[in-house]
Design a protein with these regions (language model features):
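Short pre-active-site segment immediately N-terminal to the catalytic Zn-binding motif
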Residues: 489-508
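Active-site-proximal, well-structured secondary-structure segments within enzyme catalytic domains
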Residues: 171, 175, 207, 214, ...
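Short His/Asp/Glu-rich catalytic/ion-coordination signatures at enzyme active sites or charged loops
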Residues: 52-67, 116-138, 158-200, 259-299, ...
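Cleavable N-terminal signal peptides
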Residues: 29-30
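C-terminal, non-catalytic "cap/extension" segments appended to globular domains
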Residues: 40-63, 255-257, 386-388, 408-412, ...
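Bacterial N-terminal signal peptides that target proteins for export
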Residues: 3-16
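Bacterial N-terminal signal peptides
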Residues: 15-25
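N-terminal helix-rich structural modules
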Residues: 33-236, 240, 668, 725
Length: 725
């Protein structure tokens, strides 16, 4: 997953209602917000000047929780001064004194915010959460005050209207058109009174998004399954039990503790033979944020959906999705929904055939009835064993984390792009589990820094993602500092970190995002790296997943952690053959979440406040995805992607991007597979380009034609010819 909350704002000029400049503070009211004394900011703050560490990497060993708030406030205040100077420049507007000046603004803010965003997502604590609560409405006001600045927009519009006569190079012309469209989308053409209404909506939205995230993090932590009865853990491996015991010990509890993942289904359900335990864990997951307690998210999300509809109406759109998709590849919610709707019949039909396979098992207990979702993973694993003669416990010893990283992820990057990696233990990190690598070009030229933070923690958001601490820009003279975060099960002390093949795929996926950021080769930060539409940003990451099962790569990293022996060819073949196993279920749960997202965000402003349970049931029926044994991958109440992480009206992007990546991989296979020439061409024509040209044209030029949906259906085993395999 690509974290978009910051990237939607990345290099957009912002303003704030809090002013703190070089230790001299002043405040003004921002709506009805509670005022807070400003903290001092000066040379002792680690964000005061650009970091002197390699690549300007943050000095995490020097940064204290108390440093973030004054640095963020000072950064916003400084950027406001810079932007006001641009807006009030007495000289006629030019590309240099307006667009380039805007691209240079906000560097202090970026330094502080990027590091703050990293730690609050991956290593938060109560003090950071307070800062987050305090800053959330201010960052919304910060953006609005500039997006809605009449003088600034007048200069932007003047240059936009004259762009054809300015002899701009292609990237500069793209910047003019992109920024103009973004300002219009943000409401620059609204009346003054409507701008004030929009500011209040944006402020409330930012506050509620932060509230949702905090509630969900606490709800997910509280939902962990605790037991002192070892019989309830029957089916788990010794390593899994040891990790659960370590988890309990870390929480000062007796017995074992199984933390919740962010998805509806939980990995341990595939192994637990105790049906009562499975059902209890599933219930913990399903109802984690709907218990009527302080962590219940339903009221928060219902208001978020409502105010987003109100915001869209104010901006002249029938619903939020119609507004939000204007700059995406899909363009309209109707196009996105048609795309999803076309996939539903094949996915649900395949899921139904998979349900029949489960019902045919000799030890299936449900009396011939459809499988209960709490039992699906366990019995699907039995089908996997019977059908492919292997289970996940057999393969994990061949997927030791460090081996997968160095001989899989890094190996593929070397074969395709010539990259090499050197661990930098001298650089500070935000948590002891984090590792840092310097990345080099084939000729030894430094390219980037890359951090990886792979193990689950209570104070870390669920899921996996990529983001940047420093973005690439020729204008600013910066190279990328990028990080990947995941939530793999941390082994007991002295034990190896053994992964499932899904975990392996996640590593390749997130590193695909990292490559997109590291290969950025653009002038302007607003167009650099992963600053692309949602339905394109997942394409490079999902494309990189394919190399996890590519024979030459797989054989290189799939080695037993004790003996170093390669995975037996027969077992490896079974894994590859089983790639389409359970894809009916997997794809149906993804489509259900995608359609649910679109249903929430196509509500008109006139719709009343929704009851999430009723809305969800009706939405799934309406989209033909009310399948009793396949719940959505995310229930509305814990769908963090759409309520806080920038994927609102955009979760379809994963599937849209999958169409692009499957077609792209087919191109590689048709042109010689994993070769340096193919990798360099892909890097040059796609990965390095960021948002410097129309993404559809960029993709079509590289591919040599428009994408087709057929490779997606084939790779998921959803064509009729694939069903019996």
């Amino acid at each position: 997953m690509m974290h978009l909350q910051r990237n939607l704002r990345k290099r957009r000029v912002l303003a704030t209602a809090i002013f703190v400049v070089l230790g001299v503070a002043a405040t003004r009211t921002c709506g009805a917000q509670t005022q807070k004394p400003a903290s001092s900011f000066g040379p002792s703050n680690p964000f005061y000047a650009p970091s002197t560490r390699p690549f300007q990497a943050p000095a995490f060993d020097k940064i204290k929780d108390s440093d973030y708030e004054p640095a963020i406030d000072a950064g916003m205040a400084q950027q406001l001064i810079e932007v006001e100077a641009i807006a009030n420049n007495p000289a006629p507007p030019t590309f240099e004194n307006t667009f380039v000046a805007l691209e240079r603004s906000g560097q202090l803010y970026d330094r502080a915010w990027n590091a703050f965003n990293c730690v609050t997502q991956a290593n938060t604590d109560p003090e950071l959460e307070k800062v987050q609560d305090y800053e959330a409405p201010r960052t919304a006001a910060h953006q609005d005050a500039i997006d809605l600045n009449t003088k600034l927009f007048a200069r932007i519009k003047t240059i936009y209207d004259e762009r054809a006569s300015l002899s701009l190079d292609a990237e500069s012309l793209r910047l003019v058109e992109y920024q103009y469209q973004q300002f219009v989308k943000a409401g620059a053409n609204l009346s003054d009174s409507d701008k004030e209404k929009l500011k209040k909506l944006d402020e409330e939205e930012s506050t509620l998004e932060n509230t949702f995230m905090t509630k969900l993090l606490d709800a997910t932590t509280a939902g962990a399954y605790s037991t002192t009865d070892p019989s309830t853990l029957a089916g788990l491996s010794a390593g899994q039990k040891a990790a659960a015991a370590e988890e309990a010990n870390a929480h000062k509890q007796q017995g074992w503790l199984l933390p919740l993942q962010n998805t509806t289904q939980q990995p341990d359900l595939a192994f637990l033979s105790d049906r009562a335990a499975r059902h209890e864990i599933f219930e913990h997951s399903w109802n984690r944020a709907e218990r009527g307690d302080a962590n219940d998210t339903r009221t928060t999300l219902a208001r978020l959906a409502q105010l987003r509809a109100e915001k869209a109406a104010l901006l002249g759109y029938p619903n939020y999705a119609a507004w939000n998709l204007t700059d995406q590849m899909a363009k309209t919610p109707e196009a996105a929904i048609r795309f999803l709707d076309a996939l539903v019949p094949a996915a649900t039909a395949k899921a139904a055939s998979e349900a029949k396979e489960i019902q045919a098992l000799g030890d299936y207990p449900n009396g011939g009835a459809a499988p209960d979702p709490a039992d699906w993973e366990f019995y699907a694993e039995q089908v996997r064993k019977a059908k492919f003669d292997y289970d996940q416990a057999q393969v994990k010893p061949y997927f030791e984390l460090n081996n997968v990283l160095e001989k899989g992820v890094f190996y593929a990057a070397n074969e395709l792009y010539g990259l090499t990696f050197k661990e930098r233990k001298d650089l500070p990190v935000w948590q002891p589990d984090v590792r840092v690598f310097e990345v080099f070009e084939a000729d030894g030229t430094p390219l980037a820094l890359w951090y990886c933070d792979y193990f689950k923690r209570d104070n870390k958001n669920g899921g996996a993602w990529e983001d940047s601490l420093v973005g690439q820009s020729k204008l600013l003279g910066t190279l990328p500092v990028v990080y990947n975060v995941a939530n793999f099960e941390k082994p007991a002390p002295g034990e190896p970190a053994l992964l499932s093949f899904d975990d392996v795929t996640t590593m390749f996926h997130e590193f695909g995002h990292a490559l997109h950021a590291m290969f950025a080769n653009t002038v302007y930060p607003s167009l650099s790296g992963t600053a692309v539409p949602r339905d394109f940003v997942e394409f490079p990451s999902q494309f990189n997943e394919h190399w996890a099962s590519y024979p030459a790569v797989f054989a290189h990293f799939a080695r037993h952690y004790k003996t170093g022996e390669s995975m037996p060819a027969e077992l490896a073949a079974k894994i590859v053959k089983a790639k389409t196993f359970n894809q009916g279920y997997d794809f149906t749960e993804i489509l259900a979440a995608s359609e649910l997202d679109m249903q929430w965000h196509t509500l008109p402003a006139s719709a009343p406040l929704q009851d999430p349970y009723t809305f969800e049931q009706e939405a799934l029926k309406r989209t033909h995805l009310s399948v009793s044994y396949v719940p959505p991958r995310y229930r509305s109440s814990y769908f963090l992607h759409i309520w806080q992480e920038g994927y609102q009206a955009g979760y379809y992007a994963y599937t849209w991007s999958e169409m692009l990546d499957d077609d792209a991989f087919q191109w590689f296979e048709d042109h010689g597979g994993m070769t340096r020439a193919n990798g360099d061409r892909f890097r040059r024509m796609v990965l390095s380009r960021g948002n410097t040209e129309d993404l559809e044209k960029m993709y079509d030029a590289w591919l040599g034609g428009e994408p087709s949906i057929e490779p997606l259906l084939k790779n998921r085993g959803l064509t009729e010819a694939e069903w019996g395999k």
